[in-house]
Every structure is written in structure tokens, then in C-alpha cells.
Regions:
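Active-site neighborhood of glycoside hydrolase catalytic domains
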Residues: 177, 181-185, 191-200, 204-281, ...
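Catalytic domains of carbohydrate-active enzymes, especially glycoside hydrolases
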Residues: 62-89, 192-195, 297
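Pro/Thr/Ser/Gly-rich low-complexity, intrinsically disordered linker/stalk tracts
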Residues: 387-439, 494-506
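Beta-strand-rich modules
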Residues: 474-496
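Active-site-adjacent "subsite" loops/lids of carbohydrate-active enzymes
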Residues: 37, 45, 49-62, 134, ...
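Aromatic- and acidic-residue-enriched segments that line the glycan-binding/catalytic groove
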Residues: 89-104, 140-166, 202-227, 273-285
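Substrate-binding cleft of secreted/luminal carbohydrate-active enzymes
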Residues: 292-318, 329, 334-405
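Aromatic-lined carbohydrate-binding/catalytic grooves of carbohydrate-active enzymes
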Residues: 75-112
């Protein structure tokens, strides 16, 4: 994320003039109710973390289980879990070594050979009806050049494919073989793990260090001319390198597991208006010019499935006003899936979190938020967990449907039945769930209505459970209260089936 290991250059972002004016197009919803469909994510960062390396596998399982439980209670429905912070792995991999942030030493496996953190997190999220997005950093290899790499690391085999910039080490983005290797890592994850998405954040070309050019002369001289770029077009060439990677990752995912999404969380400013008349009324570092990340192109071309810009600034910030940027992204995302990255600490310090969420919900094309950073929810920083649960997420929400990937509906559940046993009262149903067929039912939504209440499946407050199971345990309320329960199926793309209903007395 933009806070972790950022070079000191970042004073470059705190700039000249107060943002003023509004974008030409302001699109808002006519009314804002509690949304039934809303992305509610939390980033779980592993880079720079020391908490895991002091845990054995049993302790880590308990910690992960409690993490997912607490996030679920706060209304989070998608966990973005960092599994590749430094060309390493929080999962079993034959391509890259175990992460030092997991066990303290790169290449050292967990004490329990059967423990796979990514697989465990997927299971914990899915059993609660939540998504797991596997978060990868594409180019970074070392956050500090003095860090030791495990034997057999790809850098040890091909040091010529890497460059040092400042005090860090990176894959050279200009080399085709590096793009292929990164895609091989993606293919390995998607083929072996039921991740709901592959996620990358704002780290493409590294954040610039004042007075220090990025050392890619060698790859530029090797490839630029043959790719149609002149010596004066190095910026365009760098953008093309990242474009090629993003497109190749998308095709890799689509060819491996078509239901898996690809999401990007870019830095919050695409371009400033002073550099581009279509840019935002801001004065800060830019995706396009400084990180060589043309996020608008990726959205327009359909190379990514969701865009999650990090709008971490305060409302009224002099260089990058939150509200100005929110309106700009709302008007410049080609009506595709758009979520907003929120900084919990900065927002709470300014007493702005609820206002920011309300503003995001007023936007026509914004359909969710993601919180940086997730550990603050777990630690209940300034009471944020309770605020999310009670004030911001008082009702459950389903992930927005990715109809551009598949727009059919799964079959409705059948034989919705009330079952009594000696010690349990529950609903059960049949379905056409097939794990290898993502267009079939993958999880189920349970709604509850009072017996005289109108059945309206658009009311988020009537959702009482999202589950992968084909049963739901019913509460006991004295035996004289009448309800209507409704069950629907969701496919892997979030499309919802027709409802099945049953009348009950609890």
C-alpha cells in the first residue's frame, strides 16, 4: 500500500495549491439506502509485519480464524490478503520461497508441514460467505537491499533480470521474461487455490526518488526501438511494459480459472489537470506520469475487473481533496466496477469516516469501499470495529455481481425443507452446486421476513446469512412467531437465482 516502505520523496505529493472547483460531470444516486450490493474489503498487509514470525502454526491458525471472525462481525465481505510481498510466498510454492514475514527467515517453512496460510484463509473466509482476494506485489524483491534471499531464489539464478533502485531490489519491468515469470506465479495460485480474485495495489514502477533515475537503460536499449519507441519516449515505453503485464495477467487468469477476478488498487490520482485537461483538480504524484500505471486504459480495455483507487486524503486536503477525487473517479471509470480505498486512521483522526462512506454511497458508479489497514479493525482502533458494525454496516451486503464476466442466473434451490432433530431445528435445501462449474450455485443467501411483511429481496436488512452450506440452523423464539424464510443461490460471479420460500413458526 502507499504507506508501506514509501521513499522519503513523498513530500513531492504535498504540494502547491488548494484543490478547488468540481469535475465537469457529477453523477449521484437519487437516494441512498443501505445497499444490498456493496464491496466491503479490508487489506491484510504482511510486508513489514513481525507478528506472524513469532507464532507457531497452531497459534497462527487461531489468529487467522479470529481475524476473519472479527472482520465478518464488522461487516467486511472481502479480505485482501497479501500473499506475495517480496517475490516470496504465504503459501506452498515451487516457484518462490516461503516469506520471511511468515517465519522470520525467507525459505523457512512453517513448523507444521501441512499448514498452508493461503489455503487456510480461503477456507475461513468461504465458510463465512466472504471472499478472499490474493494480493501480490508484481515487481518488488527486497524492501531493503541487505535482506537475505533464500537459496534457489530466482534472483540467485538470474541476477541480470533485476535492478536496484534506492535501497530496494526489483524485477526489471522491461524484460519479457519477467512478465512471463510473474504470470507463471499468478497461474500457479489461480490453478491451485480457489481465490476469488488476484489483487495488486499501487506498486508498479517504484515511487520516484528525487534526483535518481530508474536504472533501466539496459532493457530500454534492448527493446524500446523494436517496440516502436524513440529515445525520447521512455515514459511511454515504461507504461507499455506495465500495460503488457496487466493484459497478460488478465489473459492468464481467464485461461486458468475464468471466474477469478483481477483487481487493481492504484494510487488515488490518475493525472493532475495541469498535465492533462481531463485530469483531476489536484496537485500530487500521478499514476500515469510517475508510476507508469495507465489505470484508465486498463479499465477501458477490460483488462481488470475492478478498480479500487486509494483516496486516503482528508476532505478539503490542499493538494488532493477526497471529495474532488471521489467525483473524478466516479465520472472516469467507464461505468465499470469501482470501489474506494479508505484510510481508517486519517479518516477517524479527522472524524470523517462516516461522511466519506456516505459520499461514496451517493456516487452512481461507486459500489463499495475497502479499508486500510485491516489490523486497525482487528484491534478496534478508536472503536472503529463497532462503528463499522453498528453505523456503517448495520446490515449484510452481497458483493456486486460481475455481470461482464457472466450474466446468467444459477438455478434456484429446490426442496426447501424444515427439519427437526432431537437437538436441532434447521432449514435444508437441494441445489446444483458444482465446484468446477462457476455458473452454478456456489453459496446461498438466507433472508427472513415477518409473516405479514412484503417480500422485497432488495432490502439488505432482511439478509441474515450468506453461506456455502445447504442448511441453516434456525433459532428458537418461543414457538409462536411466524416468519417467511427465503433462500437464493449465488454463482461464482455474484449472480443471484430466483427465490425459494417457506413459512415457519419459531
Amino acid at each position: 500500500m502507499i504507506k508501506a516502505f514509501r521513499p522519503l520523496f513523498f513530500i513531492f505529493v504535498i504540494l502547491l495549491f488548494a484543490a478547488c472547483g468540481t469535475p465537469k460531470t457529477i453523477l449521484t444516486r437519487q437516494s441512498v439506502a443501505m445497499p444490498k450490493r456493496e464491496f466491503r474489503g479490508a487489506w491484510i498487509q504482511t510486508v513489514g509485519q513481525s507478528r506472524y514470525q513469532h507464532m507457531n502454526s497452531a497459534a497462527m491458525k487461531h489468529y487467522f480464524s479470529e481475524m476473519v471472525r472479527k472482520l465478518d462481525e464488522a461487516g467486511i465481505n472481502a479480505v485482501i490478503f497479501q500473499v506475495r510481498p517480496e517475490a516470496d510466498a504465504f503459501y506452498k510454492s515451487e516457484l518462490e520461497p516461503w516469506s520471511r514475514f511468515l517465519t522470520g527467515v525467507q525459505g523457512k517453512a512453517p513448523d507444521d508441514p501441512s499448514f498452508d496460510p493461503l489455503a487456510f484463509m480461503i477456507e475461513e473466509c468461504h465458510r463465512r460467505g466472504m471472499e478472499l482476494h490474493a494480493w501480490l506485489n508484481p515487481y518488488r524483491v527486497k524492501t531493503n537491499i541487505s535482506n537475505r534471499l533464500a537459496g534457489g531464489h530466482i534472483y540467485e539464478r538470474y541476477p541480470e533480470r533485476f535492478v536496484q533502485y534506492g535501497n530496494q531490489l526489483f524485477f526489471d519491468p522491461g524484460l519479457p521474461e519477467n512478465r512471463s515469470f510473474i504470470c507463471e506465479v499468478v497461474r500457479d495460485i489461480v490453478s491451485r487455490y480457489e481465490v476469488d480474485a488476484i489483487h495488486m495495489d499501487d506498486y508498479f514502477y517504484p515511487y520516484p526518488i528525487a534526483g535518481t533515475p530508474f536504472p533501466d537503460d539496459k532493457s530500454f536499449s534492448m527493446y524500446a526501438a523494436s517496440q516502436g519507441f524513440s529515445p525520447s519516449q521512455r515514459g511511454d515505453w515504461r507504461r507499455n511494459n506495465v500495460n503488457l503485464l496487466i493484459r497478460q495477467i488478465k489473459y492468464t487468469i481467464a485461461g486458468t480459472r475464468p471466474s477469478t477476478r483481477f483487481g487493481i488498487s492504484p494510487f488515488g490520482i490518475y493525472r493532475n489537470r495541469r498535465n492533462d485537461p481531463e485530469g483531476s483538480d489536484t496537485n500530487g504524484l500521478q499514476n500515469y506520469d510517475d508510476l507508469y500505471a495507465d489505470i484508465k486504459l486498463w479499465v477501458e480495455k477490460g483488462w481488470i475487473d475492478y478498480n479500487l483507487p486509494q483516496l486516503y486524503w482528508e476532505i478539503g486536503h490542499a493538494a488532493a481533496d477526497y471529495t474532488t477525487l471521489l467525483h473524478w473517479w466516479n465520472a472516469n471509470n467507464f461505468q465499470q466496477h469501482l470501489y474506494i480505498g479508505q484510510d481508517l486512521k486519517r479518516s477517524i483522526d479527522k472524524n470523517e469516516l462516516q461522511t466519506k462512506i456516505r459520499q461514496s454511497r451517493e456516487m452512481t458508479f461507486v459500489h463499495g469501499n475497502c479499508y486500510w489497514y485491516g489490523y486497525q479493525i482487528l484491534d478496534d482502533f478508536e472503536g472503529v470495529a463497532g462503528m463499522l458494525k453498528t453505523d456503517i454496516h448495520p446490515a449484510r451486503a452481497l458483493i456486486p455481481a460481475y455481470t461482464h464476466m457472466h450474466d446468467g442466473r444459477p438455478g434456484a434451490v429446490k426442496k426447501l425443507t424444515e427439519v427437526f432433530t432431537e437437538d436441532m431445528h434447521f432449514l435444508t435445501w437441494e441445489h446444483n452446486k458444482r465446484p468446477l462449474q462457476p455458473e452454478t450455485a456456489q453459496k446461498f443467501v438466507v433472508y427472513r421476513f415477518h409473516h405479514k411483511e412484503k417480500i422485497d429481496l432488495n432490502r439488505a436488512e432482511n439478509i441474515i446469512q450468506v453461506t456455502p452450506d445447504n442448511f441453516f440452523v434456525l433459532p428458537y423464539e418461543g414457538g409462536d412467531k411466524r416468519y417467511i424464510y427465503v433462500v437464493t443461490a449465488l454463482d461464482a460471479f455474484g449472480n443471484e437465482s430466483k427465490p425459494s420460500r417457506i413459512k415457519l413458526k419459531l
